[in-house]
Regions:
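Short, Lys/Arg-enriched N-terminal segments with co-localized hydrophobic residues
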Residues: 1-4
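C-terminal binding/interaction regions
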Residues: 8-10, 14-15, 93-155
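Glycine-rich phosphate/diphosphate-binding loop of Rossmann-like nucleotide-binding domains
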Residues: 9-27
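A short beta-strand-loop structural module common to alpha/beta enzyme folds
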Residues: 32-43
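Structural motif
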Residues: 42-51
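Alpha-helical segments flanking ligand/cofactor-binding loops in enzyme cores
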Residues: 51, 55, 77, 97-100, ...
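Helix-adjacent hinge/juxtasegments
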Residues: 52-90
């Protein structure tokens, strides 16, 4: 299921195996994937990967991104520092749906120490199908961007 999408993926060493599994899963479904690393299980600085991935989205190359680390939390914190990016951790179907329908998040963060690969694949099936549409949440998402712009201008 799901329309074909351009997706950028990234991880730290803790989630390298999960990233490889999910990358293949998404490619097998006909999605276009770019991998910003890491490419092995050597120690890495996950914020560098998050930064790289978010740039691919903010510059318009990719619609959505998936960031994987031990819990997804560090990746989400870092991604949300990038102006224009909305990222969330989701390991359940309701959060996954709301992160897009309510918050128009472009970046899904998951933890390799939290979720089994098979469960992550099932979540991705839903994630690919869900779209953001203007509606009751639009003023809220707009307000998020206003808050972001306020602090960006203060620097």
């Amino acid at each position: 299921g799901g329309i074909k999408m351009k997706i950028v993926v990234g991880c730290d060493e803790a989630a390298y195996k999960l990233k490889e599994t999910l990358k293949k899963y998404l490619e097998d479904k006909g999605n276009e994937i770019v991998d910003v690393g890491v490419y092995n299980e050597n120690p890495s600085l996950y914020p560098e990967t998050a930064d790289k991935l978010c740039k691919e989205i903010t510059n318009g190359n990719y619609e959505r991104g998936i960031l994987l680390c031990g819990t997804g939390i560090g990746m989400a914190i870092t991604a949300n520092k990038v102006p224009g990016i909305r990222a969330a951790v989701a390991h359940d179907i309701f959060s996954l749906e709301r992160m897009i329908k309510s918050n128009n998040c472009q970046v899904l963060c998951m933890g390799a120490r939290i979720i089994a690969p098979q469960s992550a694949e099932l979540l991705l099936d839903t994630w690919l199908d869900i779209k953001y549409h203007d509606g009751p949440s639009t003023p809220k998402v707009n307000r998020i961007m206003e808050v972001e712009n306020h602090y960006r201008c203060m620097r």
